[in-house]
UniProtKB/Swiss-Prot annotation:
Species whose genome carries this gene: Methylorubrum populi (strain ATCC BAA-705 / NCIMB 13946 / BJ001) (Methylobacterium populi)
Binding site for substrate: 31, 38, 143, 348
Protein's recorded name: 8-amino-7-oxononanoate synthase
Top-rank taxon, per record: Bacteria
Binding site for pyridoxal 5'-phosphate: 118-119, 191, 216-219, 236-239
Length: 387
């Protein structure tokens, strides 16, 4: 059959994109990139305006610490701007090797493996460990990359209701016998709600059913007490450590296996040496100066107390709004008052639960926290009553 060469807008790429964008716009779900110049002390500049940012995961302000910047600058001069190859070729730089050794020691594990990002780490870990005939059980509020890695593995993947240990137990009792291997995926601190997983109970269940547990510690490292460690401890270098990248800490055997089998490590360029050096210096500071760790949570609790919200258990506090349009409007109103608090909308969160995700840093001061609380009390009293 000869191809139809007549113009057909409904089949064109641009028409398809325009139609989808119109639907997103109508639902207040279209995403846009906004140029943001981050500075020290929780400052951010957008559109020529200086704002106080409560939408950054730099929980200890280490991205602007002069010691971290100096470490990155030194690595940049010594090793160049990029790794130049995958880690298994020539992209495994000295700062990367030193960082892995320090991460493993910090987590109490035998070894560590650094990936290009936390997302890439979770894309690679599950498929390297489980597959068809295996079982993955994942918390319903787990990060998107946990679900993406689970799907790529080919294992039977079942969700359990957020932090519902009883349901997790029931699923293990029902499904574990038919599976060769089982993997439980959860987070130490949940990124959009700021609450914490009941890890002691989950790990006890895992032991009873011979299941492996991966804990995503992206938002916990350095700012919350870790409690009991899981066999698989992954996280990022881009939040508390102020740099970029992701990692897994585990036994030497597991790390050696992933070095050969994790496709998101094998088939991508290694992390830039400067990023690794920055993360290494930041981790050294976290360990040497533990007095900073409690400040983000202290400020978060000051904020929740001012507004009558449930007491914070991490530096992340959600202010639930509901409709995406309302969350955008509240974010814009706060920006007009000098605060950058970005609206979080579906599909990042469930429909009807759009929110402002307020993130606290050691770089904030009490006056900034109180001013934000005062503005929210005036602008969003209904959201605060609903909490």
């Amino acid at each position: 059959m000869a191809p139809n060469l007549s113009p057909n807008p409904s089949n064109s790429l641009d028409a398809f994109a325009a139609e989808k964008l119109a639907g997103l716009e109508a639902a207040a779900l279209r995403r846009r990139l906004a140029v943001t110049a981050r500075g020290p002390e929780a400052a951010a500049e957008r559109g020529g305006r200086r704002l106080v940012s409560f939408s950054c995961n730099d929980y200890l302000g280490l991205a602007h610490d002069p010691r971290v910047i100096a470490a990155a600058s030194d690595a940049l001069r010594r090793y160049g701007a990029g790794a130049g190859a995958s880690r298994l070729v020539t992209g495994n730089s000295p700062p990367l090797a030193a960082l892995e050794e320090r991460l493993a020691r910090h987590k109490g594990k035998e070894a560590a493996l650094v990936f290009g990002s936390g997302y890439l780490a979770n894309l690679g870990i599950a498929p390297a460990l489980v597959g068809q005939g295996d079982l993955i059980l994942i918390d319903d509020l787990g990060h998107s990359c946990l679900f993406a890695g689970a799907r790529m593995s080919g294992a039977l993947t079942l969700r359990f209701t957020h932090n519902d240990v009883a349901q997790l137990r029931a699923l293990l009792a029902e499904q574990r016998g038919a599976a060769r291997r089982a993997l439980i995926l959860t987070e130490r601190v949940f990124s959009m709600d700021g609450d914490r997983a009941p890890l002691a109970e989950i790990l006890a269940l895992a032991g009873a059913y011979d299941a492996w547990t991966l804990v995503d510690d992206a938002h916990g490292l350095g700012v919350v007490e870790p409690g009991q460690r899981a066999p698989l401890e992954m996280g990022t270098l881009s939040k508390t450590l102020g740099s970029y990248g992701g990692y897994l800490c585990a036994s030497r055997a597991v790390i050696d296996l992933l070095t050969s089998r994790a496709r998101s490590l094998v088939y991508t360029t290694g992390l830039p040496p400067a990023s690794a050096a920055a993360a290494l210096k930041a981790l050294e500071i976290v360990e040497a100066e533990p007095e900073h760790a409690a400040r983000p949570l202290m400020l978060a609790r000051r904020f929740t107390a001012r507004l009558g919200l449930p007491e914070a258990t991490s530096p992340i506090v959600p202010v639930l709004v509901g409709a995406a349009e309302s969350a955008l409007a509240l974010s814009a109103a706060l920006e007009a008052r000098g605060f950058l608090v970005v609206a979080i909308r579906p599909p990042t969160v469930a429909p009807g639960t759009a929110r402002l995700r307020v993130a606290f840093s050691a770089a904030h001061d009490a006056a900034q926290v109180d001013a934000l609380a005062e503005a929210l009390a005036e602008l969003a009293p209904d959201s605060l009553r609903a909490a």
